[in-house]
Curated annotation (Swiss-Prot):
Organism superkingdom: Bacteria
UniProt entry keywords in alphabetical sequence: Cobalamin biosynthesis, Methyltransferase, S-adenosyl-L-methionine, Transferase
GO biological process, one term: methylation
EC code(s) of this entry: 2.1.1.195
Name the record gives this protein: Cobalt-precorrin-5B C(1)-methyltransferase
Gene: cbiD
NCBIfam families with a match to the protein in the record: cbiD, PRK00075.1-1
Associated pathway: Cofactor biosynthesis; adenosylcobalamin biosynthesis; cob(II)yrinate a,c-diamide from sirohydrochlorin (anaerobic route): step 6/10
Catalytic activities: Co-precorrin-5B + S-adenosyl-L-methionine = Co-precorrin-6A + S-adenosyl-L-homocysteine
Protein source organism: Geobacillus kaustophilus (strain HTA426)
Amino acid sequence: METKKTLREGYTTGSCAAAATKAALTALITGQVQTDATIRLPIGRVVTFSLASCSFEGETATAAVVKDGGDDPDATHGALIVSTVSWASSPGVHIDGGEGVGRVTKPGLPVPVGEAAINPVPRQMIREAVNEVLAQYGLHRGVKVVISVPGGEEIAKKTLNPRLGIMGGISILGTRGIVVPFSTAAYRASIVQALQVAKANGCRHVVITTGGRSEKYAMQEYPHLPEEAFIEMGDFVGFTLKQCKRLGIKMVSMVGMMGKFSKVAQGVMMVHSKSAPVDFGFLAALAEQAGASSALVAAVRGANTAAQVGDMMQEAGCTKFFELLCEACCRAALNEVGGGLTVATSIYTMNGQRLGKAVQIDGDDETDRRGS
């Protein structure tokens, strides 16, 4: 029997930055090139990082660590995280971002506008690394730390940073110090952050989508909304709706396709392909309610995919089916959060044709079958 492979954990950009900082400061103090650095992660684990480089000249030292994302490589996997350390004229640890580290331009993030996108936990890890080395050598001096990521501006284009208003590079992130492979917690955290930015920038109406293609169609449907109002929720429909309500967002538009929204209509709020199968009996009942012929209802019941059902109903000109499906999605969403929101649902084909739309405002249904 084949044994299941254990996925290898990686380390966050914050952990890499802290390790590089410790090595650079040690080199600055001792005048010796370092080959590795050992730090304690926020979860309590002690880890030794090998250095990609270490050098010093005069009152400055630099060390670098290659980011290893483990078996869940993200856009920053393989990036060089560089720390340049020098003595500061004032006491304390002064942290800033250099080349390839983004700068915050919009409110709603854990870091104030104008500062380098180095999140609070990595900042604390860097401070702890500096203080540990200073204590080891009995020194009481101010230290300046600049974190940089060569090529970080290009890497950032593959992340949510431009949407979040983090310009010029990547963020230095991490709350636990490790990257758990395919962690749902990381994706949920990105949803919350995107919603917080939307709210902080005055968005009272957000559009949540199941993926990049759905988001493209959503932007065409709601061209008047700013970019930060559009949030990819992936499979986390229920979680995203609850976060919208928690943050006081009043209008939520859901945009997606037949496969996932056929599940949402039944109250399935985690719509991964493995989480719940499409219920073709439910879709057949909707088709019957929409006035489909008995032969078409039977065909729906025996279909292989929800997209196939959509094609069948579209070819038959049964637009009422899509109205009913969108209405069911709105009701399920409101039921999930206990009301208090206005919810719209739009369902699209893979090619970007809108099949139907419904809006539920405090218990009232409005339906718009076609067009924009």
